Amino acid sequence: MILACDVGGTKTNVALLESRGGAFEIVRLETFQSREHDSLEEILAAFIGSGTLPLEAAGFGVAGPVIGGRAIITNLPWQIEALQLADRFRLPTVALLNDVEALAWAVDSLPDAEILTLQPGLSVVGNVAVVAAGTGLGVSALVRSAGITVSLASEGGHADFAARSNLEVDLLTFLRSRHGHVSVERVLSGPGLVSIHEFLRGSEGGDEPEWLVSGLRSGHPAAAIVRAAMNGSSQACARAVDLFLGIYGAEAGNWALRTLATGGVFLGGGIAAKLLVASSGASEAWRRRAIDLFLLGFLEKGRFRPMLERVPVRVILNDSAPLIGAARCAEIASAARR
C-alpha cells in the first residue's frame, strides 16, 4: 500500500493506492481544504487516525519547489520536510516532489480513456513534456535516456513571458506596469486570463452584461470569462480566451522544443479541461475552434514546425493523475532502497 498526497494552495487530496501490474488503483481518497489546517502533518493525522497503516512508501506532490528534501508551498504558510514526515508517521520511504513533476510520473500509467488527443502526431518512445495551467503554471518532463526514465523538476512557469505580436507586446507592457517582472505564469493561468481580459477591456472598451460584472467580482472571475466567451455574450471575453489559447499553445510548443518531446506533450490543470475539452458545456464547434487556436500557437515555430507536427498533443482527463504520479515515484524510490 502506498500513501499519496497532492498538496495545493486550495485543497489537499490524500489517498491510499495499490500497485497492480504496473497500474495503480485508488483504494481510499479524501479531500481536505488546505487553509483550514495548520500543516500537512495535521491533515495526515486526520487521514490516518489513531491506528497505523501497512505502508510501503509515501509520495507527496506539492505546489512549490522542493530543494534538499524541503518544500515551501507557494500559496500556503506551510513548510514540508521529507525526513520529518518519515519520522512522524513511520514511513519507510518518502518521495517529496513538485506537483507537476508528480503529474509527469503519471503519464505512462494513464489508459487511453483518460486522455484526449488534440494532435495524434507520431507515436514514438521519447521525452514527454507536461504543461499544467491552473491557479499557476507548472511544467515538467519525463526524460528518457539509456533505458532510464526520470521526471524533471522545474519552476519554468516563472521564466520570462515572450511576446510574439504587437498585441502581446502591448499586453506585456500592461503587465509590466503592474508586476515589474512578467513571468509566463502572469499570463498563462487563471489570474492571467483575468489580466488579459482587463487589458483588452481597457484598450477596447464596451459594456459587459450585468451577470458577467457580478461574476468578475466573485471568487471565480476566470470561470466567468470562459462562460461568457463560450456563450458569446462578451466580445472582450471571447478575445481574451482567443489570445490565451494562442499563448498556451505557444508555450506548450516552447516546452516541447526545450525538452525535445518526441514522445508527446501532455496538458494538465483545470484550464485545459475547461477550454479544450469544453467541459463547461460549449458546442463542439467552439471546442474545435479552441483546439485550432491552441495548435496554431503550438506549431508556429518557423523551421521547426515540421518537427512539432509529429509531436502528439494530449489532455490529461484524470483528476487523480497527480496522486498516481506521486505513488509511482514513491514506488520507484522504495525499490531503489532494497
What is the meaning of each model-derived region?
Residues M1-L53, D170-R338:
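ATP-binding/phosphotransfer module of carbohydrate and carboxylate kinases, centering on a glycine-rich
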Residues R90-P92, V124-V128, A261-T262, R310-V311:
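Short coil/turn connectors at secondary-structure junctions
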Residues D6, D99, G134:
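Active-site glycine-centered loops adjacent to acidic/histidine catalytic or metal-binding residues
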Residues I115-P120, V124-E185, L276, W286-L308:
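Glycine-rich phosphate-binding loop of actin/hexokinase-like ATP-binding domains
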Residues R20-G22, P111, S145-I148:
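Short, surface-exposed beta-strand-loop junctions and turns on beta-sheet-rich folds
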Residues G49-L96, E101-E114, V130, G264, ...:
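Short beta-strand-loop/turn "lid" adjacent to the catalytic site in phosphate-handling enzymes
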